């Protein structure tokens, strides 16, 4: 990301609300990258390093992030009309959050089955 001109702005840990199973982690890292000119819109919302947001799987896909958590990041790091790049699109939770918060998005997913799942999810909005 550094080579593309983006800096690591913030790193958080998301504590998932439910235990998926004993062989999987019940937390995930949240990495927020942006340009050097970035100014935080809500410093208070980002003071805690561990975030607690409910986890909801979608269509058997358990790796998706919480929509509330994604909205928290999008609304802090972008303005209405800006583009959000999601290089791990998954089932499209970030893209749905972008639509709901009036941001544009560019999603990348290498797994064809997961990508088609995301496209069908987005097509009903």
Predicted features by range, described:
Residues 123-124:
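Conserved phosphoryl-transfer catalytic core
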Residues 1-115:
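Core catalytic lobe of class I
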Residues 118-119:
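Conserved SAM-binding loop
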């Amino acid at each position: 990301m550094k080579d593309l001109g983006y800096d690591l702005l913030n790193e958080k840990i998301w504590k998932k609300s439910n235990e998926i199973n004993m062989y999987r982690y019940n937390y995930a890292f949240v990495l927020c990258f942006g340009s050097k000119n970035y100014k935080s819109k809500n410093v208070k919302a980002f003071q805690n390093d561990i975030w607690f947001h409910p986890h909801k799987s979608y269509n058997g896909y358990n790796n998706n992030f919480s929509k509330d958590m994604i909205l928290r990041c999008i609304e802090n790091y972008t303005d209405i009309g800006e583009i959000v790049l999601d290089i791990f699109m998954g089932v499209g939770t970030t893209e749905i959050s972008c639509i709901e918060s009036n941001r544009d998005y560019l999603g990348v997913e290498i797994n064809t089955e997961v990508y088609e799942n995301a496209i069908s999810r987005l097509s009903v909005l």
